[in-house]
Amino acid sequence: MAHQIEQMAYVGQTPWHGLGNQLSPNQPIEVWAKQAGMDWRIESSNVSYMAQNSRGQSIIMPYEEQRVLYRSDTHAPLSVVSQRYQEVQPMEILEFYRDLTEQSGFELETAGVLKGGKKFWALARTGQTAELKGGDVSNGYILLATACDGTLATTAQFTNIRVVCNNTLAIALRGQSSNTGVVKVPHSTKFDADKVKDQLGISVKTWYDHMYEMKQLTQRKVTQKEAAAYFDAVFNNNSLSAMEQEDNIIQYYRNVASQANPQPNKTEPNGRAMTKVMNMFNGQGRGADLSSAKDTAYGLLCAITEFVDHERRAMSTDHRLDSAWFGAGAALKQRGLEQALYLAA
């Protein structure tokens, strides 16, 4: 199977998926564009189709309500969109960071193209860092991504990357009504980089608010019963109420037993995944034995993020990256964050 990552560039250590061109630090945007495979434009053409007239002759007919988007370099098709669709160019994603890298101390760390150009992104380190107890370090990033195949609005969001395991966690803690943490620009609206930066509120406060909550999670000790209830809530979208926790722990051990003695046509939902994350929480995960994570709500969250980023079943590492940042995996991590904060409240 061909890689979904058409091309990618990075600085620092080789990414966990092992793909991309390594760059030395502080390269200009133009170098990033070439090495990350983003030095092309999205072009468009009106849709037409072949038909036959009454004499059996082939004629080309226009369909004026739709356009085909295609790559300027290879002319490969990307998607079919309406006339109202506002495309965002690959260079616009990189240009978003130009003043941030040149004037504000940000540093691009990775950028690339997925699905042959249908989706592209750039990730920059903000320079913000924090250390939880036990030497557990996290760094702050801003991820900007877009797609032209209808799968993603242009999205800018703060992201926390835990150093010990390279797990990513979107920082979007203030709910749908607030602009703090994430900004989404639908493709019915023209992308305005300056407006997005204003809405995103690129500030120290967002980072410190997030790390304060992570610290709260490290201080919330959890029992095995609470851990099982947490994973059940995350994977099966159940409640974490005290009344249900007894049932959840029983259900968890039923999952374990059903895998040891499988019965035909009878499997518990997400049993394999729940067993995996429980084992990661109990010491098999990266950094699971650090005092910040051992037997804490933060450890529960770290088990979820590591599972999504590194262990969850996927057709390829590229599909896993796409899911972990933009798809079902990202939603699972957000669910894990919400449930962990519920525990610590």
Where are the model-predicted features located?
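Short, well-ordered loop/turn elements at secondary-structure boundaries
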Residues: E64-E65, G117-K118, S138
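Generic structural hydrophobic/aromatic packing signal, biased to beta-strands
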Residues: L69, A122-A124, L144
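N-terminal low-complexity, intrinsically disordered segments
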Residues: M1-L114
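Beta-rich nucleic-acid/ligand-interaction surfaces
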Residues: T110-T129
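Intrinsically disordered, low-complexity regions enriched in serine/threonine
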Residues: M1-S54, Q128-A345
